[in-house]
Amino acid sequence: MSRIGNIPVLIPNNVFVKKQDNIIYINGPLGKLNQKIIGDINIIINNNNIIVKRKHNDKKNRALHGLYRMLIYNMIKGVYNGFKKKLELIGVGFRAKNNSNILDLNIGYSHNIIIKLPKSITLEVKMEKNKNTQIILKSYDKQLLGIVAAKIRSLRKPEPYKGKGIRYINEYVIKKTGKSAK
């Protein structure tokens, strides 16, 4: 029995939910999202909550039960409040620039890396004196936001000796000791 899957999802006032065939559509103040439902999973939409039920108790449906409940919850939370990911550039000379949703990174390579972000993601770059540069990504789509943030981080992962690179805010990097002198 899925404990997460049994919890009903509350629908806020400004969010509209519609189910058509095997697709659930969620529309809110920040945007529109949809999710295709596969397997024997039933979505029941009441007045202001959504209940996810499974028809059969086989292994696949038990796995999908909690998954779809959390996907729907994240979609509703995203179109109502939105999500935010913060990245930090750590290293001498590491810079980031925002040119109308195009991220221009100077992270120690011989050339700048230019990333064009999807329209649903907004970008903000904070550069303060004596602090590391921060990249703040905001979106209503949690899946897309996570993919884009992971792609940016993968361009220069934090290295284990000095910790230089791109990392999430509050990410802890285990540092190795260097060579020991004789």
Swiss-Prot record:
A matching Pfam family: Ribosomal_L6
Keywords (A to Z) from UniProt: Ribonucleoprotein, Ribosomal protein, RNA-binding, rRNA-binding
Keyword presence, Glycoprotein: no
Transmembrane segments: none
GO cellular component: cytosolic large ribosomal subunit
GO molecular function: rRNA binding; structural constituent of ribosome
Matches recorded under SUPFAM superfamilies: Ribosomal protein L6
Biological role stated in the UniProt entry: This protein binds to the 23S rRNA, and is important in its secondary structure. It is located near the subunit interface in the base of the L7/L12 stalk, and near the tRNA binding site of the peptidyltransferase center.
Subunit structure: Part of the 50S ribosomal subunit.
The family this protein is said to belong to: Belongs to the universal ribosomal protein uL6 family.
Protein name, per record: Large ribosomal subunit protein uL6
Gene assigned in the entry: rplF
